[in-house]
């Protein structure tokens, strides 16, 4: 079994490619199940955010795994494999694990040190667990990376004063308008990104905020938190006509702000309008950027603002490299020890079988034993067995991570009289439990 990661992110693909390869939240479970049915795929988790789409998989062979991951992506998004291949990256084994540690801790994010990705990775893992597409390896790996990410944010300054995409949006508005006092803002969408944007807007002193959302109750809930107004979705253009700044972040699959409508609207509008599209797929047609006085920014346009004050956090990332490498080594040592688990269980079961035979013999030869005496003898015998096996099992685990592990383990089995059948039975039981 091998760990293989395939994906694309803000490093490898522009937004016009990324937005075509986003898994819809309503289709997450179906995507996981479909991928699990591909040849070579043993376990899988899909992470899909505004800046990355990545698949972490356990495969039976690296070469075939790479092919079937690519084929799945091409089929799912109905695109030619050759068209998406230039934007994809692959990480294998230790590189894949190292990458996941960095992603989860926010060390590979557009916003260095941001914590939102931690929640997104946890969500992706939980969905995969519920859908039964994870097993022994990915369950262990994702628990470890989530724990590590929490420690990083708690014990370092990586997320201290970290800018966010929504923060960058406010900074762009300040550069264009100077003071944001008395500026009218319209926020389209009422999800997590919209809430983060509102937090930054409130911190900038803006008070004239209108929230528009297709589901009005969601807009009302958000508006109540920030003393904002709620606008009717069907009257969106009327609100845009009065707006100075528009932030758009919805889960719509197609643009909701169209070039033709905006061309007409801007001809009626007396002032310029800043439109910041932080949705993926994008919520505003790109051709709107050609309309006079219509200043359009998308996520990639905000990148320069986001990275402007990240020098200190980049230093923290470098300092964490050795720690991550240590975590990666620990994971693969644990994985190697997985191979001896059936041997350990077979040894314990053999010892317990011997105890059971001995206790039956004692019962026959010493019929005068009381029930209490019989139980006490059994407990002491089990204690002796555990003490006798403790050191050999510890040595076996050490052997499992050495270069000549296979030979050493075979010697161990022969010394303790463990047959191939003894171990195979345990392995089959484990496989049935995992499935």
UniProtKB/Swiss-Prot annotation:
Gene3D superfamilies: Glutamyl-tRNA reductase, N-terminal domain, NAD(P)-binding Rossmann-like Domain. Pathway: Porphyrin-containing compound metabolism; protoporphyrin-IX biosynthesis; 5-aminolevulinate from L-glutamyl-tRNA(Glu): step 1/2. The keyword Aminoacyl-tRNA synthetase does not apply. Pfam families: GlutR_dimer, GlutR_N, Shikimate_DH. It comes from the Bacteria. GO terms for molecular function: glutamyl-tRNA reductase activity; NADP binding. It catalyses: (S)-4-amino-5-oxopentanoate + tRNA(Glu) + NADP(+) = L-glutamyl-tRNA(Glu) + NADPH + H(+). It is an enzyme of class 1 (oxidoreductase). The active site is at 50 (nucleophile). Its EC number is 1.2.1.70. Possesses an unusual extended V-shaped dimeric structure with each monomer consisting of three distinct domains arranged along a curved 'spinal' alpha-helix. The N-terminal catalytic domain specifically recognizes the glutamate moiety of the substrate. The second domain is the NADPH-binding domain, and the third C-terminal domain is responsible for dimerization. Homodimer. This is Glutamyl-tRNA reductase.
């Amino acid at each position: 079994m091998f760990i293989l990661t395939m994906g694309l992110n803000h490093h490898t693909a522009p937004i016009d490619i990324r937005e075509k390869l986003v898994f819809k939240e309503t289709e997450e479970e179906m995507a996981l199940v479909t991928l699990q049915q591909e040849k070579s795929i043993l376990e899988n988790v899909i992470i899909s955010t505004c800046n990355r789409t990545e698949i972490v998989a356990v495969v039976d062979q690296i070469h075939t795994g790479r092919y079937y991951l690519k084929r799945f992506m091409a089929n799912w998004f109905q695109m030619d494999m050759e068209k998406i291949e230039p934007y994809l990256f692959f990480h294998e084994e230790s590189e894949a694990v190292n990458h996941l540690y960095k992603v989860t801790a926010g060390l590979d994010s557009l916003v260095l040190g941001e914590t939102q990705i931690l929640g997104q990775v946890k969500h992706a893992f939980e969905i995969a667990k519920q859908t039964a597409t994870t097993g022994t390896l990915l369950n262990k790996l994702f628990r470890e990376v989530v724990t590590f990410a929490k420690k990083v944010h708690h014990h370092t300054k990586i997320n201290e004063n970290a800018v966010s995409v929504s923060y960058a949006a406010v900074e762009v508005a300040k550069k264009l308008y100077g003071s944001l006092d008395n500026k009218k803002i319209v926020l389209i969408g009422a999800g997590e990104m919209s809430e983060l944007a509102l937090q930054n807007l409130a911190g900038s002193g803006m008070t004239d905020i209108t929230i528009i959302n297709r589901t009005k109750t969601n807009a009302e809930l958000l508006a109540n938190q920030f003393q904002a107004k709620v606008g009717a979705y069907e009257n969106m253009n009327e609100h845009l006509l009065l707006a100075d700044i528009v932030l758009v972040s919805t889960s719509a699959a197609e643009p909701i702000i169209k070039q033709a409508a905006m061309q007409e609207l801007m001809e009626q509008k007396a002032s310029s309008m800043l439109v910041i599209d932080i949705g993926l797929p994008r919520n505003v047609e790109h051709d709107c950027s050609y309309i006079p006085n219509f200043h359009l920014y998308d996520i990639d346009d905000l990148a320069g603002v986001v990275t402007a004050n990240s020098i200190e956090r980049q230093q923290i990332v470098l300092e964490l490299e050795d720690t991550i490498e240590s975590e990666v080594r620990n994971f693969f040592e644990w994985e190697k020890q997985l191979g001896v688990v059936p041997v350990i269980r077979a040894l314990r079961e053999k010892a317990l079988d011997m105890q059971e035979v001995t206790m039956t013999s004692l019962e026959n030869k010493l019929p005068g034993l009381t029930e209490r005496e019989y139980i006490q003898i059994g407990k002491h015998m089990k204690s002796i067995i555990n003490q006798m096996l403790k050191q050999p099992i510890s040595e076996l685990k050490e052997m499992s991570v050495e270069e000549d592990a296979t030979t050493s383990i075979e010697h161990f089995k022969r010394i303790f009289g463990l047959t191939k059948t003894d171990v195979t039975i345990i392995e089959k039981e484990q496989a049935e439990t995992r499935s």
